[in-house]
Protein backbone atom coordinates (compact mmCIF):
# COMPACT_ATOMS: atom_id res chain seq x y z
CA UNK A 1 0.00 0.00 0.00
CA UNK A 2 3.04 2.29 0.05
CA UNK A 3 4.78 3.79 3.07
CA UNK A 4 4.33 7.11 4.86
CA UNK A 5 8.04 7.63 5.37
CA UNK A 6 7.44 11.06 6.92
CA UNK A 7 6.70 9.19 10.16
CA UNK A 8 9.41 10.22 12.67
CA UNK A 9 10.58 6.62 13.03
CA UNK A 10 10.97 6.27 9.25
CA UNK A 11 12.27 9.73 8.42
CA UNK A 12 15.29 9.75 6.11
CA UNK A 13 14.93 6.10 5.11
CA UNK A 14 13.47 6.57 1.62
CA UNK A 15 16.02 5.86 -1.12
CA UNK A 16 13.86 5.11 -4.17
CA UNK A 17 10.35 4.05 -5.11
CA UNK A 18 8.06 2.83 -7.85
CA UNK A 19 4.30 2.49 -8.28
CA UNK A 20 2.99 0.20 -11.04
CA UNK A 21 -0.70 0.87 -10.24
CA UNK A 22 -0.71 4.59 -9.68
CA UNK A 23 -3.86 5.04 -11.74
CA UNK A 24 -6.00 3.27 -9.12
CA UNK A 25 -5.11 5.35 -6.05
CA UNK A 26 -6.79 8.01 -3.97
CA UNK A 27 -3.84 10.28 -4.77
CA UNK A 28 -4.15 9.74 -8.54
CA UNK A 29 -3.84 13.50 -9.28
CA UNK A 30 -0.36 13.49 -7.73
CA UNK A 31 0.48 10.33 -9.65
CA UNK A 32 -0.61 11.88 -12.93
CA UNK A 33 1.32 15.06 -12.22
CA UNK A 34 4.40 12.90 -11.65
CA UNK A 35 4.33 12.29 -15.39
CA UNK A 36 4.74 9.39 -17.81
CA UNK A 37 1.17 8.20 -17.35
CA UNK A 38 1.76 7.74 -13.63
CA UNK A 39 4.34 4.98 -14.24
CA UNK A 40 7.50 6.85 -13.36
CA UNK A 41 10.10 4.07 -13.29
CA UNK A 42 13.37 5.87 -12.50
CA UNK A 43 12.98 5.37 -8.75
CA UNK A 44 12.08 8.98 -8.02
CA UNK A 45 8.40 8.41 -7.16
CA UNK A 46 7.58 8.13 -3.45
CA UNK A 47 4.35 6.10 -2.93
CA UNK A 48 2.27 7.16 0.07
CA UNK A 49 0.10 4.86 2.17
CA UNK A 50 -3.69 5.32 2.22
CA UNK A 51 -4.31 2.12 4.18
CA UNK A 52 -1.74 1.83 7.04
CA UNK A 53 -0.60 -1.68 6.09
CA UNK A 54 2.64 -0.70 4.37
CA UNK A 55 3.69 1.79 7.05
CA UNK A 56 3.02 -0.74 9.81
CA UNK A 57 5.03 -3.43 8.02
CA UNK A 58 8.11 -1.30 7.35
CA UNK A 59 8.00 -0.21 10.98
CA UNK A 60 8.47 -3.83 12.04
CA UNK A 61 11.67 -4.09 10.04
CA UNK A 62 13.10 -0.60 9.99
CA UNK A 63 11.58 1.91 12.44
CA UNK A 64 14.07 3.74 14.64
CA UNK A 65 11.59 4.29 17.47
CA UNK A 66 12.00 8.06 17.27
CA UNK A 67 8.93 10.05 18.33
CA UNK A 68 7.75 13.34 16.82
CA UNK A 69 9.34 15.28 19.71
CA UNK A 70 12.70 13.62 19.05
CA UNK A 71 12.58 11.30 22.04
CA UNK A 72 13.49 7.63 21.74
CA UNK A 73 10.76 5.05 22.28
CA UNK A 74 11.18 1.28 22.59
CA UNK A 75 9.20 0.62 19.40
CA UNK A 76 11.97 0.04 16.88
CA UNK A 77 12.26 -2.52 14.10
CA UNK A 78 14.57 -5.51 13.89
CA UNK A 79 16.97 -3.57 11.60
CA UNK A 80 16.54 0.09 12.60
CA UNK A 81 19.44 1.26 10.42
CA UNK A 82 18.01 -0.25 7.23
CA UNK A 83 16.75 1.91 4.36
CA UNK A 84 13.63 1.79 2.18
CA UNK A 85 12.96 1.07 -1.48
CA UNK A 86 9.19 1.66 -1.59
CA UNK A 87 7.42 -0.38 -4.31
CA UNK A 88 3.63 -0.24 -4.03
CA UNK A 89 2.07 -3.29 -5.75
CA UNK A 90 -1.50 -2.79 -4.54
CA UNK A 91 -3.67 0.29 -4.34
CA UNK A 92 -2.92 2.72 -1.55
CA UNK A 93 -6.23 1.86 0.15
CA UNK A 94 -5.43 -1.85 0.26
CA UNK A 95 -7.03 -3.38 -2.84
CA UNK A 96 -5.11 -5.63 -5.17
CA UNK A 97 -2.47 -6.36 -6.22
CA UNK A 98 -4.44 -5.02 -9.12
CA UNK A 99 -4.85 -6.90 -12.37
CA UNK A 100 -5.96 -4.62 -15.20
CA UNK A 101 -7.76 -6.93 -17.61
CA UNK A 102 -8.65 -4.04 -19.94
CA UNK A 103 -5.05 -3.82 -21.08
CA UNK A 104 -2.16 -6.26 -21.45
CA UNK A 105 -2.06 -8.21 -18.18
CA UNK A 106 1.61 -9.10 -18.52
CA UNK A 107 2.59 -5.44 -18.62
CA UNK A 108 0.11 -4.07 -16.11
CA UNK A 109 -0.35 -6.79 -13.49
CA UNK A 110 0.97 -4.82 -10.58
CA UNK A 111 2.71 -7.47 -8.50
CA UNK A 112 4.60 -8.90 -11.47
CA UNK A 113 5.45 -5.42 -12.69
CA UNK A 114 6.68 -4.26 -9.30
CA UNK A 115 8.80 -7.33 -8.57
CA UNK A 116 10.31 -7.24 -12.05
CA UNK A 117 11.23 -3.59 -11.46
CA UNK A 118 13.01 -4.65 -8.27
CA UNK A 119 14.95 -7.35 -10.10
CA UNK A 120 15.87 -4.92 -12.88
CA UNK A 121 17.16 -2.43 -10.30
CA UNK A 122 18.99 -4.79 -7.96
CA UNK A 123 22.30 -3.06 -8.74
CA UNK A 124 21.08 0.46 -9.56
CA UNK A 125 23.22 3.35 -8.34
CA UNK A 126 20.49 5.52 -6.85
CA UNK A 127 21.30 9.22 -7.21
CA UNK A 128 22.09 11.31 -4.17
CA UNK A 129 22.78 8.47 -1.72
CA UNK A 130 25.88 6.75 -0.41
CA UNK A 131 27.21 3.84 -2.44
CA UNK A 132 26.33 1.50 0.42
CA UNK A 133 22.65 2.18 -0.34
CA UNK A 134 22.84 1.33 -4.03
CA UNK A 135 20.80 -1.57 -5.37
CA UNK A 136 18.21 -3.67 -3.54
CA UNK A 137 19.08 -6.47 -1.10
CA UNK A 138 15.79 -7.76 0.33
CA UNK A 139 12.14 -8.03 -0.72
CA UNK A 140 9.76 -8.00 2.25
CA UNK A 141 6.37 -9.05 0.88
CA UNK A 142 3.35 -9.04 3.19
CA UNK A 143 0.72 -9.91 0.62
CA UNK A 144 -0.92 -12.96 -0.92
CA UNK A 145 -2.06 -12.98 -4.51
CA UNK A 146 -3.94 -16.08 -5.71
CA UNK A 147 -6.54 -18.24 -4.01
CA UNK A 148 -5.46 -21.07 -1.71
CA UNK A 149 -8.65 -22.99 -2.51
CA UNK A 150 -8.34 -26.47 -3.97
CA UNK A 151 -4.95 -27.02 -2.41
CA UNK A 152 -3.43 -23.69 -3.35
CA UNK A 153 -0.32 -23.17 -5.42
CA UNK A 154 2.37 -25.75 -6.10
CA UNK A 155 4.98 -23.05 -6.67
CA UNK A 156 4.61 -22.96 -10.45
CA UNK A 157 2.22 -19.98 -10.61
CA UNK A 158 3.70 -16.82 -12.15
CA UNK A 159 3.97 -14.97 -8.84
CA UNK A 160 5.87 -17.74 -7.08
CA UNK A 161 8.18 -18.11 -10.06
CA UNK A 162 9.06 -14.42 -10.26
CA UNK A 163 10.02 -14.56 -6.58
CA UNK A 164 12.27 -17.51 -7.43
CA UNK A 165 13.78 -15.32 -10.14
CA UNK A 166 14.42 -12.59 -7.58
CA UNK A 167 16.22 -15.04 -5.29
CA UNK A 168 18.33 -16.33 -8.16
CA UNK A 169 19.24 -12.75 -9.07
CA UNK A 170 20.74 -12.21 -5.61
CA UNK A 171 17.81 -10.59 -3.78
CA UNK A 172 16.62 -12.32 -0.59
CA UNK A 173 12.82 -12.70 -0.44
CA UNK A 174 10.81 -12.90 2.78
CA UNK A 175 7.09 -13.50 2.10
CA UNK A 176 4.01 -13.94 4.31
CA UNK A 177 2.44 -17.39 4.58
CA UNK A 178 -1.08 -16.00 4.93
CA UNK A 179 -3.77 -15.93 7.59
CA UNK A 180 -5.90 -18.97 6.71
CA UNK A 181 -5.36 -20.83 9.96
CA UNK A 182 -4.74 -24.54 10.55
CA UNK A 183 -6.94 -25.87 7.74
CA UNK A 184 -4.70 -27.72 5.29
CA UNK A 185 -5.69 -25.79 2.18
CA UNK A 186 -2.12 -25.17 1.08
CA UNK A 187 -0.64 -21.76 0.43
CA UNK A 188 -1.47 -19.08 -2.11
CA UNK A 189 0.84 -17.81 -4.82
CA UNK A 190 3.98 -15.98 -3.61
CA UNK A 191 3.92 -17.90 -0.32
CA UNK A 192 4.56 -21.05 -2.37
CA UNK A 193 7.75 -19.87 -4.05
CA UNK A 194 10.38 -22.64 -4.10
CA UNK A 195 13.28 -20.45 -3.06
CA UNK A 196 11.75 -17.66 -0.97
CA UNK A 197 11.57 -17.70 2.82
CA UNK A 198 7.89 -18.12 3.73
CA UNK A 199 7.01 -16.73 7.15
CA UNK A 200 4.29 -17.81 9.57
CA UNK A 201 3.27 -15.93 12.72
CA UNK A 202 3.81 -16.84 16.35
CA UNK A 203 1.87 -15.75 19.45
CA UNK A 204 3.73 -15.10 22.70
CA UNK A 205 0.53 -15.09 24.78
CA UNK A 206 1.49 -11.62 26.01
CA UNK A 207 4.12 -13.07 28.34
CA UNK A 208 7.91 -12.95 28.41
CA UNK A 209 8.04 -16.71 29.01
CA UNK A 210 9.12 -18.21 25.69
CA UNK A 211 8.03 -21.71 26.70
CA UNK A 212 4.37 -20.81 26.09
CA UNK A 213 4.91 -19.35 22.61
CA UNK A 214 2.78 -21.02 19.94
CA UNK A 215 2.05 -20.78 16.24
CA UNK A 216 -0.68 -18.13 16.02
CA UNK A 217 -4.19 -19.52 15.53
CA UNK A 218 -4.67 -17.57 12.29
CA UNK A 219 -1.29 -18.39 10.73
CA UNK A 220 -1.35 -20.59 7.62
CA UNK A 221 0.36 -23.90 8.36
CA UNK A 222 1.02 -25.27 4.91
CA UNK A 223 2.30 -27.43 3.39
CA UNK A 224 2.01 -26.10 -0.11
CA UNK A 225 0.51 -28.29 -2.83
CA UNK A 226 2.79 -31.01 -4.23
CA UNK A 227 4.47 -29.97 -7.48
CA UNK A 228 5.14 -33.57 -8.51
CA UNK A 229 8.94 -33.40 -8.40
CA UNK A 230 9.21 -36.35 -5.95
CA UNK A 231 10.86 -34.09 -3.39
CA UNK A 232 8.48 -33.75 -0.43
CA UNK A 233 10.86 -31.45 1.42
CA UNK A 234 10.21 -28.44 -0.78
CA UNK A 235 6.51 -28.60 0.08
CA UNK A 236 7.33 -27.93 3.74
CA UNK A 237 6.33 -24.29 4.05
CA UNK A 238 6.43 -21.97 5.91
CA UNK A 239 10.10 -22.30 6.83
CA UNK A 240 9.98 -20.05 9.89
CA UNK A 241 7.59 -18.21 12.21
CA UNK A 242 8.11 -14.86 13.91
CA UNK A 243 6.11 -12.64 16.28
CA UNK A 244 2.99 -11.41 14.51
CA UNK A 245 0.32 -11.11 17.20
CA UNK A 246 -0.83 -7.87 18.84
CA UNK A 247 2.05 -5.99 17.26
CA UNK A 248 2.46 -2.27 17.93
CA UNK A 249 2.62 -0.39 14.64
CA UNK A 250 4.14 2.77 13.24
CA UNK A 251 1.09 4.85 12.33
CA UNK A 252 0.49 6.14 8.83
CA UNK A 253 -1.25 9.40 7.96
CA UNK A 254 -4.61 7.65 7.54
CA UNK A 255 -4.71 6.68 11.24
CA UNK A 256 -4.98 10.36 12.20
CA UNK A 257 -8.50 11.72 11.95
CA UNK A 258 -8.93 13.72 8.75
CA UNK A 259 -5.36 13.15 7.56
CA UNK A 260 -5.00 12.66 3.80
CA UNK A 261 -1.75 12.45 1.87
CA UNK A 262 -3.47 13.71 -1.26
CA UNK A 263 -4.60 16.82 0.63
CA UNK A 264 -1.11 17.61 1.89
CA UNK A 265 -1.24 15.69 5.15
CA UNK A 266 1.55 13.43 6.37
CA UNK A 267 2.55 11.17 9.26
CA UNK A 268 5.30 13.41 10.64
CA UNK A 269 3.45 13.88 13.94
CA UNK A 270 2.39 10.27 14.39
CA UNK A 271 3.52 7.68 16.92
CA UNK A 272 3.28 3.90 17.57
CA UNK A 273 -0.01 3.11 19.31
CA UNK A 274 -2.03 1.03 16.83
CA UNK A 275 -1.90 -2.77 17.12
CA UNK A 276 -2.42 -5.53 14.59
CA UNK A 277 -1.94 -9.25 14.03
CA UNK A 278 -1.03 -11.31 11.00
CA UNK A 279 1.75 -12.98 9.07
CA UNK A 280 2.10 -9.57 7.41
CA UNK A 281 3.74 -8.31 10.60
CA UNK A 282 5.85 -11.40 11.19
CA UNK A 283 7.39 -11.16 7.72
CA UNK A 284 9.15 -7.77 8.03
CA UNK A 285 10.64 -8.82 11.37
CA UNK A 286 12.33 -11.68 9.51
CA UNK A 287 13.32 -9.29 6.71
CA UNK A 288 15.07 -7.09 9.25
CA UNK A 289 16.95 -10.07 10.68
CA UNK A 290 18.02 -10.97 7.14
CA UNK A 291 19.34 -7.42 6.74
CA UNK A 292 21.42 -7.84 9.90
CA UNK A 293 22.75 -11.17 8.63
CA UNK A 294 23.75 -9.59 5.32
CA UNK A 295 25.47 -6.74 7.15
CA UNK A 296 27.38 -9.17 9.37
CA UNK A 297 28.32 -11.51 6.53
CA UNK A 298 29.62 -8.67 4.37
CA UNK A 299 32.40 -8.18 6.92
CA UNK A 300 33.79 -11.52 5.80
CA UNK A 301 32.20 -12.65 2.54
CA UNK A 302 29.31 -12.02 0.15
CA UNK A 303 26.35 -14.17 1.28
CA UNK A 304 24.07 -15.69 -1.31
CA UNK A 305 20.28 -15.76 -0.81
CA UNK A 306 20.45 -19.55 -0.57
CA UNK A 307 23.05 -19.32 2.19
CA UNK A 308 20.78 -16.99 4.16
CA UNK A 309 17.80 -19.26 3.55
CA UNK A 310 19.67 -22.15 5.14
Tell what function each PLM region has:
Residues 1-109, 131-137, 168, 192-196, ...:
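Subtilisin-like serine protease catalytic core
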Amino acid sequence: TGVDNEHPGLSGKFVAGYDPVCYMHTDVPRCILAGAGARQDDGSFDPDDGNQHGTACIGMSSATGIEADGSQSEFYGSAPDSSLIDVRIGTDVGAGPFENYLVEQEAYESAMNGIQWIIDNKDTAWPGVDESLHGIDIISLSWGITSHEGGGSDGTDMHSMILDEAMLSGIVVSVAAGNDGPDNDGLSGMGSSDLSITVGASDDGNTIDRSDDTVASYSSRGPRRDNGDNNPLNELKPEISAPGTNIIQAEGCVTSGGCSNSAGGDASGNTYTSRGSGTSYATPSVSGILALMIEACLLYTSPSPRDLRR
